[in-house]
Amino acid sequence: MKGIFLVLEGIDGCGKSTQIEHLAQWLPLSGLMPSAAKLFITREPGGTRLGKSLRQLLLGTSPTDESPKPLTELLLYAADRAQHVSQVIQPKINNGDWVISDRFSSSTLAYQGFGRRLDKSLIKELENIATQGITPDLTFLLEIPVSESIKRRENTRKDRIESEGEIFLKRVSDGFSYIAKNDNWLVIPANQKKDIVSKQIENKLINYFQNISSLKNERS
């Protein structure tokens, strides 16, 4: 039996890391996971040893003072994802385990496609290669206003992508809202107290797996 692949997406400051930490504690005790399944938490970029080096280049924490151009940036994200899928996500899912990733391919479409305004058809072509056909079972978009994102990050050290201006971030936010119209996306208003957001995610997951169970029973 294959495992489950969950992804949390959203603009910077939306609270993904906080909610993933909560899920890491809640899911194994929720009764949703098979007893033999393990839960793995990962992220993009940087979900592998190679990916950590790529993350430094992409986010501007590398010793080099040379920033990648937009097309180079896109290709580096694709390289990170190809390694991540091959080395982490695919093997874990094939083993029946559950994987939660902080960002996946939709972040590339939102940031590089909508934010950088790179060719979206090229991005999708690269993503098809990098993901090797892997798609999340469910993606949560933690949605906050751009103004709230900026406010939350006021006194934090920003990486290269986070340092982009408000106009760029608005394009990214609009991109996520557009992408989230696809199937298997759930939008959570994240401009609320953390525990309220956590409870909404829990309820959505419970409903999702109950519906899957009902469909299986109908077909059997």
From Swiss-Prot:
Keyword rRNA processing among record annotations: no
EC code: 2.7.4.9
Binding site for ATP: 10-17
GO biological process, one term: dTTP biosynthetic process
GO cellular component: cytosol
Keyword Nucleotide-binding appears in the UniProt entry: yes
Keyword list, A-Z: ATP-binding, Kinase, Nucleotide biosynthesis, Nucleotide-binding, Transferase
Catalytic activity: dTMP + ATP = dTDP + ADP
InterPro entries (alphabetical): P-loop_NTPase, Thymidylate_kin-like_dom, Thymidylate_kin_CS, Thymidylate_kinase
Listed GO MF terms: ATP binding; dTMP kinase activity
Enzyme class: transferase
Described purpose of this protein according to its UniProt entry: Phosphorylation of dTMP to form dTDP in both de novo and salvage pathways of dTTP synthesis.
UniProt record similarity statement: Belongs to the thymidylate kinase family.
PANTHER family: THYMIDYLATE KINASE (PTHR10344), UMP-CMP KINASE 2, MITOCHONDRIAL (PTHR10344:SF4)
Protein name: Thymidylate kinase
Organism: Prochlorococcus marinus (strain SARG / CCMP1375 / SS120)
Gene name in the database record: tmk
